[in-house]
Structures are given as C-alpha cells and as structure tokens.
Amino acid sequence: MDKKHILCFLVLLPLNMALISAESEEGVNQTDLGVTRNKIMTAQYECYQKIMQDPIQQAEGLYCNRTWDGWLCWNDVAAGTESMQYCPDYFQDFDPSEKVTKICDQDGHWFRHPDSNRTWTNYTLCNNSTHEKVKTALNLFYLTIIGHGLSIASLIISLIIFFYFKSLSCQRITLHKNLFFSFICNSIVTIIHLTAVANNQALVATNPVSCKVSQFIHLYLMGCNYFWMLCEGVYLHTLIVVAVFAEKQHLMWYYFLGWGFPLLPACIHAIARSLYYNDNCWISSDTHLLYIIHGPICAALLVNLFFLLNIVRVLITKLKVTHQVESNLYMKAVRATLILVPLLGIEFVLFPWRPEGKVAEEVYDYVMHILMHFQGLLVATIFCFFNGEVQAILRRNWNQYKIQFGNGFSHSDALRSASYTVSTISDMQGYSHDCPTEHLNGKSIQDIENVALKSENMYDLVM
C-alpha cells in the first residue's frame, strides 16, 4: 500500500469511527461483531499513523517493510528472521497470552502461504487451546455461581435460626448476623454482576454509568466482608486477650468499621477510576488503582493474622493453667486455630502467588475459587451449624415437637431425651459462656473462675 492510499485511509477512518460512536449514543445496541470491528479499525488507524511517522529503515541489507496484516501491525524486519508479538483480544476465542509469528524470507519479502500464495501470519496458536480454556472458564463460572448460591441459602437459614431463638441473642451473635448479612449482599451482587455485566461484552464496551455503579457496589460489599471479619477478630481479641472482665462492649464502633469504613476506599477508587482509567465498566484489572481496594483489605487480613496468633498464644497459656493433659490442650488450641483461619481469610496469605504451568494454574484457579466463593457457606457452617448451643437448642425443640405430637415415644423415652438435652447444654458451653457471662465484672470468685475457663470452652464447638 503506497502513501497515497494510506493518507486516504487516515482521512476516511475517523469519519467512519465517528459514525459508529454516533450510533452508540443514539441507543443502537452494539453487537460483539460491531465491538470487534471497532477495535480492528482503531488498531489499523494507529498502525498506519505509525507507518507514516516512523523513520525510514537506514540499516544495510535486505529487510521486510512495515505492514498491516489485517489484525496486527508489524515493523521493519531483517531478512531471514521471525517477528513475534502477542495475540490480539478482538475475539473471545483468542488467548492474548499466546504468540503470533510472521516470517521474513531471505529475499526480504514476507512469507507467503503455499496454498494461497498470499502473505501469511501465523495466528494458529491464538485459539489452539481455546476449547480447554473455555471449558475451564465455564466450570469456574458455574463453581462461582454454585458457591454463592449455597452461601446465600446457608446464611439465610443461619440468620433465621439466630433471629428465631431469642436465647442466642448476645453481642457476638449480633456480629455474626452482620457478617452473614454482608456475605449475603455480596453474593447476590456478585451473581448479578457476573451474569448481567461481566458476560455482556457489548455492555462493557459501551461503559455505561449503571455498570460502574454495579462494580462500585460489588467492591464496597467485598470490603465489608473482610472488615466484618476484622470486627470478629477485634471482638475476640478484646474479649479473650485485652479485657476478660470488661463491661459490655460498644457495638457502634464495630458498625462503623464493618459498614462505614469500606465506603472510603470504594469512593476513592471510583473517583480515581473515573479520572484516570474510565473504561470497561471498571472491570479491567490492568491498573494499579485496584490497590486502593486491595490495600485496606490486605491490611485487615494482616491485623487479623496478628489477632489469630495472639489469641492462640493466650489460649495455650490459659489451657496450661487448667492442668489438663498436654496433648488435649494443644489439640483444643489447634481446633481453635482451624475455626479462626477461614474467619480471618488466611487463604490469601497461603496462596499469594499464581504458579506457572498449565496444570498448576488450573489447580490454583479451582482452589482459589472454592476458597473465595464458598466463604459464606464456610462461615455459616462454623458459626451456626457447628455451634454447640445451636445444635442443643434445635435438638431440644425437635424433641419437644416429637413429644407434643406423640410420634410413638413413651414417657420414659421423653424423659431420657430431655435429660440428654440438659446434659448436652451443660457440656456445650461455647456460646453459653460467650453470651450471658461475657459482661462479668468480677462480682464473685466463682464467676471469675468461670470466665477464666471461658476461652477454653468457647471453642468446644466442633466436638
């Protein structure tokens, strides 16, 4: 293509792109084909500008001239060499991490395919493993939806239990309720965001305000999850380490930390994104502005890690004071740690880096998706379904139901069931000490002894 044709193209292409933009502003829906065409035309325009502006090759010897092959722009290349660059992102089945190659023959001409006798660029690697990657991506997508769906169902059941049984009401249960509610909201918004926004390429390309608001809410609620986790850690640390005999804690500060503080990084990110990287519905991760969101979350995780280690240290010390068998003491400390690990989000500390290799990357993706998107189910299981007092209350109400409607149980069977329930409640003192006695102020020696043993019994929830 000579300079005259290039100049003509440079004049006509902006007019064509302006017409496409005008159609978008008038409300004409852009299809995937229209988005792809716009990307290719933009790349072609930039390529021809580069061809015109770059200085002429002054090196001696034969070389292939700079050119546009229809999808990518190629610089001058010395004869007998192979040029290489990454695959374009025009098509959904193209992998931008793969490479495109173009060969310059020994005579200084671009390689021609023997079948068509036309210049040819090797794009075969761009979609070589597309089928497998699409299959993996779909599996991860369905895994994400299933994880959030199970999380929503389990968290709603947990909230019904906590609200229905008034005997479970206490400050820590209140924190649990807020934590559960933040996970429910985040799961709902995540499902909507993935199905309605992230999968709609035309919507993402038009970059409307509605999808930016959706991304803002998604990032805010994600922050709420981690900061309500931090609230749980702060509460436990205050209760067990800082002030065992403290009066009732003020929950207002926990509400501010859990619901209020995440608004700050979310708003700062929204302002910065609108000013410096206002594209693709703010979904693109190719920007350092995401550190505005991830920085406070990482800080919350590190603080919670400190709380975890300090709580375990105090628990081991207190368990030694009780003069129990050493193996039993450390077993309870390990179990307490296992309860706190998912609460504090240690999975991001254990898996901070993405490994190299096809199999390793796939395993990493599955593990991270399970850890991230099944968190709600995990939290509901640990703090509700494995809660000893919740199990005792449900068992007691079930036994009362069977006695009331007389499902063939004798009077002695009913008495034995009631006796077993009472003994179970006496044994399961995890939340019994956590709720009614958490506000003691050293009124009696027996009360003080009970509170001293509270940290040991608090984690007898999974026995």
UniProtKB/Swiss-Prot annotation:
Per the UniProt record, the site (Required for ADM interaction) maps to Q201, M372
- Gene3D superfamilies from the UniProt entry: GPCR, family 2, extracellular hormone receptor domain, Rhodopsin 7-helix transmembrane proteins
Q: Which SUPFAM superfamilies match?
A: Family A G protein-coupled receptor-like, Hormone receptor domain
Keywords noted in UniProt: Cell membrane, Disulfide bond, G-protein coupled receptor, Glycoprotein, Membrane, Phosphoprotein, Receptor, Signal, Transducer, Transmembrane, Transmembrane helix
Q: Which GO terms describe its cellular component?
A: adrenomedullin receptor complex; CGRP receptor complex; endoplasmic reticulum; endosome; lysosome
Q: Which PROSITE patterns match?
A: G_PROTEIN_RECEP_F2_1 (PS00649), G_PROTEIN_RECEP_F2_2 (PS00650), G_PROTEIN_RECEP_F2_3 (PS50227), G_PROTEIN_RECEP_F2_4 (PS50261)
Ranges where the record places region Required for RAMP3 interaction: 287-288
Record topology, Extracellular segments: 23-138, 198-208, 273-288, 351-365
Note whether Signal occurs among the keywords.
Answer: yes
Describe tissue expression: Expressed predominantly in the lung, thymus, heart and brain.
Q: What is this protein called?
A: Calcitonin gene-related peptide type 1 receptor
Q: Which taxonomic lineage does the organism of this UniProt entry have?
A: Eukaryota, Metazoa, Chordata, Craniata, Vertebrata
